[in-house]
Amino acid sequence: MSQLFNFSAGPAMLPVDVLKQAQEELLNWNGQGVSVMEISHRDPVYVHMAREAEQDLRDLLNVPDDYEVLFLQGGGRGQFSAVPQNIASPDATVDYLDTGIWSGFAIREAEKFVSKVNVAGQVQEGAKGKEIQSPENWKLSENAAYFHYCPNETVDGIALHEIPDVKAPIVADMSSNILSEPLDVSKFGVIYAGAQKNIGPSGFAIAIVKKSLLGHPQKQVSSIMDYQLQAKDGSMYNTPNTFAWYLAGLVFKWLKAQGGLTAMGERNRHKAQLLYDFVDKSDFYRNDINPAYRSIMNIPFQLAYDKLDAEFLQGAKNQGLLGLKGHRFVGGMRASIYNAMPVEGVEALLNYMADFERKLG
């Protein structure tokens, strides 16, 4: 079978080398004679692997020593409620930048746990397409407990490439762009990310939390969502998702072998530029995001005629190009090109798009 390329927004494509290693080790991990899924999370061999994975992640992101790195359950949505319960009091005001579907979900969840959620800014229509309001137009609270934003919205493919300059501790939902390029972690109070896009399989999340923000959780926060408790127990207060942690560790080593985040950033920008250049030059395809705010991870595009969508998707599937259907809220197409997507996959998609346009455009 020829190689397939999975453009799904998540769960997403994983590096082939990682999958092959996991396959080889599935029945006999690390010489233990059993699968990694069958070993206790308290076993010294497993604990060593878990700590090594954490250190590799710290190395990749240059995480300062005054931050905890937590491996948690519940995915990104679990963090929507964990964040306000851990770093804001019930009577607090918090600022949220509303840049899309996932920001909206986070806002509605936060409203359950704090007195006021202030929407500081949002997406607007500009002369060059959809864009995020300029920071000078944001309406920030004077004493916000934190400022939350999602730097990369997967549904619309809109991104904020500059870290906001605000007084409050910054919380970022990086579920879809973590590890895609270098990042200055020291500018953030909390970074969290669901795993199923650039880290590993679905069902768990990473949270990177500044230690100075810990220690004052709301009374009702569940123990497994308590950042300080999980940090104290090395993310093993409850039995973690042992296989996902292991697989994430393999991904971190793969990223190091690729040259780290500087190399990945260059590769990802190149892949995205290939797609955007093709779409912008075409009269058959279009992208409605202002180029200054375009995502390098998720590239939505529309066909000239909606009636051709089903035919486009079936033809793509026949060519081994999977997961291109756009989100149900917006329709059209979407190519998610996370770290594991090789440039060859993007080139295969472009060849198919050009051929489809020649035949039906």
Swiss-Prot record:
Co-factor binding comment: Binds 1 pyridoxal phosphate per subunit.
This protein's UniProt keywords: Amino-acid biosynthesis, Aminotransferase, Cytoplasm, Pyridoxal phosphate, Pyridoxine biosynthesis, Serine biosynthesis, Transferase
EC annotation from Swiss-Prot or TrEMBL: 2.6.1.52
Modified residues (N6-(pyridoxal phosphate)lysine): K197
Cofactor: pyridoxal 5'-phosphate
InterPro entries named among the record's database cross-references: Aminotrans_V_dom (IPR000192), Aminotrans_V_PyrdxlP_BS (IPR020578), Pser_aminoTfrase (IPR022278), PyrdxlP-dep_Trfase (IPR015424), PyrdxlP-dep_Trfase_major (IPR015421), PyrdxlP-dep_Trfase_small (IPR015422)
Catalytic activity: O-phospho-L-serine + 2-oxoglutarate = 3-phosphooxypyruvate + L-glutamate; 4-(phosphooxy)-L-threonine + 2-oxoglutarate = (R)-3-hydroxy-2-oxo-4-phosphooxybutanoate + L-glutamate
Cell compartment(s), UniProt: Cytoplasm
Major subcellular location class: cytoplasm
Residue numbers binding L-glutamate: R42
GO biological process, one term: L-serine biosynthetic process
Protein residues bound to pyridoxal 5'-phosphate: G76, R77, W102, T154, D173, Q196, N238, T239
Pathway: Amino-acid biosynthesis; L-serine biosynthesis; L-serine from 3-phospho-D-glycerate: step 2/3; Cofactor biosynthesis; pyridoxine 5'-phosphate biosynthesis; pyridoxine 5'-phosphate from D-erythrose 4-phosphate: step 3/5
Tree of life domain: Bacteria
GO terms for cellular component: cytoplasm
Broadest EC class assigned to this enzyme: transferase
GO terms, molecular function: O-phospho-L-serine:2-oxoglutarate aminotransferase activity; pyridoxal phosphate binding
SUPFAM superfamilies from the UniProt entry: PLP-dependent transferases
Stated role: Catalyzes the reversible conversion of 3-phosphohydroxypyruvate to phosphoserine and of 3-hydroxy-2-oxo-4-phosphonooxybutanoate to phosphohydroxythreonine.
Protein family according to the UniProt entry: Belongs to the class-V pyridoxal-phosphate-dependent aminotransferase family. SerC subfamily.
Subunit structure: Homodimer.
Name assigned to this protein: Phosphoserine aminotransferase
Organism: Idiomarina loihiensis (strain ATCC BAA-735 / DSM 15497 / L2-TR)
Encoding gene, per UniProt annotation: serC
